[in-house]
């Protein structure tokens, strides 16, 4: 059920153009180690990738074998809306502040479904699948074209559907202007682009308008801890970096002076405190962390336990009540 608080949040998001949550986490924030299953293979099928949580905690996911987008608002136990689309095994989706849904179709294009529509409109044509999508505050859509080692972008104020290059020169490599099978992307309010550079085992930062990246995590960074095929990257409100470290089956947090595992820190399996190829990462407004646990065929949630050094999450009881 949508509340006045939800309405106020959505109005704020429309004003600043941000549709996702960026909680302010401390360097000591912790999450309960045992995850809750949000969607199993019975709901979303096998090996999920495309997933999104918006600013009022509505969950968007894809049932891949039925070409459906499933929408579950906060407070609902079941799916409230089903959108039948024309796509096959989409890798990514993103929802704008206006409620428009952008989805990788698997047919070398990105389609948009407006808030109340039942059919999609093609807004971007690409040469391969978009392994990640992002919509910035300047009405620009970004696509991580992993198989072509590039990130491309398109202003939706233009009349074309052909994007331009945002990062990567199209050659597989580890130089500062190259990427190797990039996956997750994130664009901050300064239009700086973060890229999970999977096969280079690093996260690259491309300042707005620049094509030479700076390594901020992984190989070549100041952090000595190894990462293995990062697949998703998120920046929180405190500018801490969260990374789905896919082949290490964990989620890590990077601050200005620390690097630590925060979820899936005990190997890979189907046990609730372990992950198996996490691919997509998102937060709700309470700071809970949602992860597509790909090879366990599920989407899971890790509940925030503490958000300051030594302090228990006093909002836990309230958030549980709000989500009922």
Show which residues each predicted segment covers:
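Blade/loop signatures of beta-propeller domains
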Residues: 11-34, 159
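A short beta-strand motif characteristic of beta-propeller blades
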Residues: 36-41, 78-84, 119-124, 164-175, ...
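Beta-rich, blade/repeat-based domains predominating
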Residues: 44-56, 86-101, 126-141, 172-192, ...
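Short loop/turn segments immediately following the C-termini of beta-strands
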Residues: 56, 64, 106, 146, ...
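Residue position within the beta-strands of beta-propeller blades
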Residues: 60-62, 102-104, 142-144, 194-196, ...
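Structural signal for beta-propeller blades
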Residues: 67-70, 108-111, 149-152, 201-203, ...
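Short loop/turn segments that connect beta-strands within beta-propeller blades
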Residues: 72-77, 113-118, 155-159, 207-211, ...
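Blade-level signature of beta-propeller repeat domains, shared across WD40, Kelch, NHL, RCC1
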Residues: 276-324
């Amino acid at each position: 059920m949508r509340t006045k608080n939800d309405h106020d949040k959505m109005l704020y998001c429309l004003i600043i153009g941000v549709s996702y949550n960026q909680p302010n986490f401390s360097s000591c924030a912790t999450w309960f180690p045992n995850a809750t299953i949000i969607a199993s293979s019975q709901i979303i099928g096998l090996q999920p990738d495309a997933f999104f949580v918006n600013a009022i905690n509505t969950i968007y996911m894809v049932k891949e074998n039925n070409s459906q987008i499933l929408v579950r608002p906060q407070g609902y136990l079941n799916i409230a809306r089903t959108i039948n689309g024309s796509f096959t095994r989409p890798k990514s989706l993103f929802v704008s502040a206006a409620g428009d849904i952008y989805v990788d179709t698997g047919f070398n294009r990105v389609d948009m479904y407006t808030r109340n529509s039942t059919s999609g409109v093609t807004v971007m044509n690409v040469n391969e699948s978009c392994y990640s999508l992002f919509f910035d505050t300047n009405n620009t859509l970004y696509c991580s074209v992993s198989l072509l080692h590039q990130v491309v972008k398109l202003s939706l104020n233009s009349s074309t559907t052909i994007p331009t290059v945002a990062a990567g020169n199209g050659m597989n490599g580890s130089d500062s202007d190259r990427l190797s099978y990039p996956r997750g992307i994130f664009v901050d309010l300064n239009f700086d682009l973060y890229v999970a550079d999977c096969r280079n085992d690093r996260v690259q930062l491309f300042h707005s308008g620049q094509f030479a990246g700076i390594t901020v995590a992984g190989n070549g960074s100041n952090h000595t801890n190894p990462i293995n095929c990062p697949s998703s990257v998120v920046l929180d409100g405190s500018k801490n970096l969260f990374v789905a470290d896919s082949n290490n089956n964990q989620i890590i947090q990077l601050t200005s002076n620390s690097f630590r595992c925060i979820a899936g820190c005990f190997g890979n399996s189907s046990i609730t405190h372990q992950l198996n190829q996490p691919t997509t990462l998102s937060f709700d407004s309470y700071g809970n962390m949602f992860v597509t646990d790909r090879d366990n065929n599920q989407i899971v949630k890790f509940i925030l336990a503490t958000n300051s050094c030594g302090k228990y999450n006093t909002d836990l009881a309230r958030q549980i009540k709000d989500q009922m």
